[in-house]
C-alpha cells in the first residue's frame, strides 16, 4: 500500500529560482551557509515553503462563510445550492445567519429603495475582508422592475459588488460557478483593500 518509487533516487525539493546572479549563474545568496543549511534541512523532509499571504489566501478561499440577503425569487435557487445535489459546503462555503460571522453576502432579488439602507447596514456589520455576490437580473440592474419608481437599479449603487451572477433567476449551477469565481478572485488578488 502506498506509492512505489519509479527509481531508487530520493525525492528532492525543487531548487528555488530567485534572482539569478549573471556572473555565477546561481541564485543570489545561494552561497550563504546559513540559508544553505536551512535548505538542506527542509529539502528532504517534505516541507513546503510559501509566503504568509499565500497561506492566508488559501485558507480564506476554503472557509468562506456566507449570509443570505434573499429578497425575492432568486433566494429559492440560492437555497437549492445548499441542498445535496450541489452541496456548496464541499467547497468550504458554509451559511451563517449573522453578518458579524460572515465573509460573503449574496444579494438575491429586487432591491427596493426602502430596503437599501438595511442592505448597507448589514454590509457595514460584516468584518473585513468582505465580499458581495449579486445574484439575478434584479440585483444586478433592476431586472424586470428596472423602470419602477421604488426599485434600486442595481445593488452596486449601495454596496461594492465582487461577482455578478446573471439570470432570471440564475440556476444553482450559475451561482456555484460564481462562488468558484469568487474563490479564484481571492486567490489571485488577496485581500481587497476598500
Curated annotation (Swiss-Prot):
- Disulfide bonds, which pairs? none
Alphabetized UniProt keyword annotations: 4Fe-4S, Cell inner membrane, Cell membrane, Iron, Iron-sulfur, Membrane, Metal-binding, NAD, Quinone, Translocase, Transport, Ubiquinone
List locations, semicolon-separated.
Answer: Cell inner membrane
Q: Single GO cellular component annotation? A: respiratory chain complex I
Q: Does the keyword Metal-binding apply?
A: yes
- Per the record, a Pfam family? Oxidored_q6
Q: Cofactor stoichiometry and binding?
A: Binds 1 [4Fe-4S] cluster.
Q: Which residue spans traverse the membrane?
A: none
> What PROSITE patterns does this protein's entry cite?
COMPLEX1_20K (PS01150)
Catalytic activity, as annotated:
a quinone + NADH + 5 H(+)(in) = a quinol + NAD(+) + 4 H(+)(out)
**GO annotation terms (biological process):** aerobic respiration; electron transport coupled proton transport
**For this protein, what is the EC number?**
7.1.1.-
Positions of [4Fe-4S] cluster binding: 73-74, 138, 168
Topology versus the membrane, per the UniProt entry? Peripheral membrane protein
* Cofactor(s) needed: [4Fe-4S] cluster
**The keyword Iron belongs to this UniProt entry's keyword annotation:** yes
Describe the family membership recorded for this protein in Swiss-Prot or TrEMBL.
Belongs to the complex I 20 kDa subunit family.
Q: How does it assemble?
A: NDH-1 is composed of 14 different subunits. Subunits NuoB, C, D, E, F, and G constitute the peripheral sector of the complex.
This chain's function reads: NDH-1 shuttles electrons from NADH, via FMN and iron-sulfur (Fe-S) centers, to quinones in the respiratory chain. The immediate electron acceptor for the enzyme in this species is believed to be ubiquinone. Couples the redox reaction to proton translocation (for every two electrons transferred, four hydrogen ions are translocated across the cytoplasmic membrane), and thus conserves the redox energy in a proton gradient.
Q: By what name is this protein known? A: NADH-quinone oxidoreductase subunit B 1
Amino acid at each position: 500500500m502506498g506509492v512505489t518509487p519509479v527509481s531508487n533516487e530520493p525525492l528532492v525539493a525543487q531548487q528555488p529560482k530567485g534572482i539569478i546572479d549573471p556572473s555565477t549563474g546561481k541564485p543570489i545568496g545561494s552561497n550563504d551557509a546559513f540559508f544553505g543549511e536551512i535548505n538542506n534541512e527542509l529539502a528532504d523532509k517534505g516541507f513546503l515553503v510559501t509566503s504568509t499571504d499565500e497561506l492566508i489566501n488559501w485558507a480564506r478561499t476554503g472557509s468562506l462563510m456566507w449570509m443570505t440577503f434573499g429578497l425575492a425569487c432568486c433566494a429559492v435557487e440560492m437555497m437549492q445550492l445548499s441542498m445535496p445535489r450541489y452541496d456548496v459546503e464541499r467547497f468550504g462555503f458554509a451559511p451563517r445567519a449573522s453578518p458579524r460571522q460572515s465573509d460573503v453576502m449574496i444579494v438575491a432579488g429586487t432591491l427596493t429603495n426602502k430596503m437599501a439602507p438595511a442592505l448597507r447596514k448589514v454590509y457595514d456589520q460584516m468584518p473585513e475582508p468582505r465580499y458581495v455576490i449579486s445574484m439575478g437580473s434584479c440585483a444586478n440592474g433592476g431586472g424586470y422592475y428596472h423602470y419602477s419608481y421604488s426599485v434600486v437599479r442595481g445593488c452596486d449603487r449601495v454596496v461594492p459588488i465582487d461577482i455578478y451572477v446573471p439570470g432570471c433567476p440564475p440556476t444553482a449551477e450559475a451561482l456555484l460557478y460564481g462562488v468558484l469565481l469568487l474563490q479564484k478572485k481571492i486567490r489571485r488578488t488577496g485581500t481587497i483593500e476598500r
